[in-house]
């Protein structure tokens, strides 16, 4: 059996490994476990082959399940934002969770983080654990200021919510009541389908729900039909509101078409921003407003959405351009998107560009004029002229893809791959719907670290260091050395978690392995580890001993405080080692007073033989260690007396040399007054090396200890444990002083604002030759192997509307970051001709028509949009339901994320699109002048732009 009567480690490992493979089933409950705790458990049970040597090592015993790293401070059930599966937490089914809790218990004061499995997708169903719950605000109709917040699963029903509200506000079951959705403009919507789920009802994060109780006379406070409901399709008692749009102030006809906001359904600003940009793309909007989409709906395309996305989008666009509403609530559109793209089904913040990509692809497939796609064998260039290969590629593309989306948004680029081994050149031409442009990356990042100096009286100092993003631990030490004066080669960098060393880094390890939430401690060690053979660096952890209960003599221990590193002589006496350890902790270990000394001897534990202690306080080789032993306490045993401090106050082997006091360091001599007076030891110590208590030490009359270099390694799994009796710890160990630290002025440092970059710089970076990464190689048909080839992209032809995605977000296993670089992009006359390699391409000039903005950091923040109205040619700012005028000087900002450019020869009045030609012909026949949002002199560029079109 393992600790505390738990199953043996082989059984634990086998059971959990099997349960981790459990398939998700709708309605099942799964539990979140902090990945750091789980990794510690895996080490303890030897889950992975490389951890087998630690199996059963009591010094890596994980202790109670600790999920505090997943929770917001002060909230036992609220998760931190943007947690990532496998990186921050792992998911366990109910049976697995119950087993772990029975074996290890749950940290006191914590509650299980239980989540339901929900089903997503309309046609292709798949299950997903709903990690983030929907937070709803609940109140009574008679007192809407008294709001109570509760969290629900999307799988919970309206009936479940009503029962919870009744419980909160003490409303008896027999009392007739009804629920309402309350929106921001004081509009209400009935919730009268008790079996509907939160997901089906479209309830979103932060939604206010109101319960209304029936009056004694049989009437309702809000009346038989709510007068404040502003829904043109509203009716009672049928529950149709889930499928309809909510409109503000219906019946008005004095709103300018297109100047219509979109209500935020709860973290749906990303969707609103994308829709506003597409809505203000003139050729696409005219296509839908003139019902041209109806004759091109493709209901049978297996890659499409049966026309549902196109129809839902068309309905929304018609409402936005009707001129009747100042804003609409796009719930029906949101529901359709969520059904076909489950990643957008919830109410968590998403990426605007990812939604745009899905929407453009969905509209394309729903409106694809090709009813049966032919199979086409793709060909490599094989030395043929670019013009021939490009025309072939575009023709092949049109044989399978022909829609209004292709007409407006698709272009063609050339991709060239060169094998580094055989020099094989592969050239292909591929269509694109938008350009994702890289931004010049920040080459540096800031890290906050704590420097622990060798002087035991010095508090740890917090520093902010600037290090290369693609660097190693030595770069961190070099930067810290410049601020602190401590030589980089005298530093050891560690990651401390849960009172133990989680990692001890080598100098050549990558900085990318350090995450933002890691607690990085750098220790000053005054020896040269490569040359000094007389000393050894050992990690030291602190443990508090305890008994499992008053009914048993079994003892255990738990980690506390901050671990530390220290250099000690390789050959030492037990007494000198004890004094060195006590000296290292003299800042926060209080010494006894004369009164305390005469009160009686200090007892460092109730029994010197706990955990197999020998008479000298050193654990015997091979003895049990950290958590528990089967040996009973011997209440009559007495501790051995610590030799007089005077006998050991001058240690020839103490690290630091004779000049420590001159250098301001605390030494045994300068701290003698602090150390004197103890007749009994405050703690005992035990060695642990890679899971075994087998570090060689020589036990003779002088009680010498020898650290064997063949066995001892500087590693987070090798350490010296200092075991404290609870009473002595409480009496002499000052935990507040131990946790205290100082801040260096660098912590307040804010990096200077970066200069802007031009959009053309990003385009040049996009077309720059690069070497493929090791994780993304190219298969060379000549070598018959995957190679890290060089790759170059070039633009061949550009579409009428060019969508430019600025790649502000970067992801890696250890880091998530947003680049806030200011990109200077032109409002008009963006000349792309210099980037086209097609020799027949003439000048291609574009004007900006819309911008999607993102404010805030990685994974959160807020989306808005700037857009130019096609009817009056003026700029407007769209912020969810709010629409306001904007000026051109507001548009270029660090928030710009997705840019929409329209080629000058395709604007209304040029007759470029068939619909525009029809409108132009009708205008000529009636004698009505044609309005254009471009000056007449822009037509001078028409001939120049003709050659910019596709080579089909």
From Swiss-Prot:
GO terms for cellular component: cytoplasm; mitochondrion; nucleus. Phosphorylated. Phosphorylation protects against ubiquitination and subsequent degradation by the proteasome. Ubiquitinated, leading to degradation by the proteasome. The modification N-acetylalanine is found at residue 2. The active site is at residues 269, 862. Gene3D superfamilies: Cysteine proteinases, DUSP-like, Phosphatidylinositol 3-kinase Catalytic Subunit, Chain A, domain 1. It catalyses: Thiol-dependent hydrolysis of ester, thioester, amide, peptide and isopeptide bonds formed by the C-terminal Gly of ubiquitin (a 76-residue protein attached to proteins as an intracellular targeting signal). The modification Phosphoserine is found at residues 932, 936. Pfam families: DUSP (PF06337), Ubiquitin_3 (PF14836), UCH (PF00443), USP7_C2 (PF14533). Keywords: Acetylation, Cytoplasm, Hydrolase, Mitochondrion, Nucleus, Phosphoprotein, Protease, Thiol protease, Ubl conjugation, Ubl conjugation pathway. The modification Phosphothreonine is found at residue 573. Residues 260-904 form the USP domain. Hydrolase that removes conjugated ubiquitin from target proteins and regulates various pathways such as the TGF-beta receptor signaling, NF-kappa-B and RNF41/NRDP1-PRKN pathways. Acts as a key regulator of TGF-beta receptor signaling pathway, but the precise mechanism is still unclear: according to a report, acts by promoting deubiquitination of monoubiquitinated R-SMADs (SMAD1, SMAD2 and/or SMAD3), thereby alleviating inhibition of R-SMADs and promoting activation of TGF-beta target genes. Belongs to the peptidase C19 family. This is Ubiquitin carboxyl-terminal hydrolase 15. The lineage of its organism: Eukaryota, Metazoa, Chordata, Craniata, Vertebrata. The gene is Usp15.
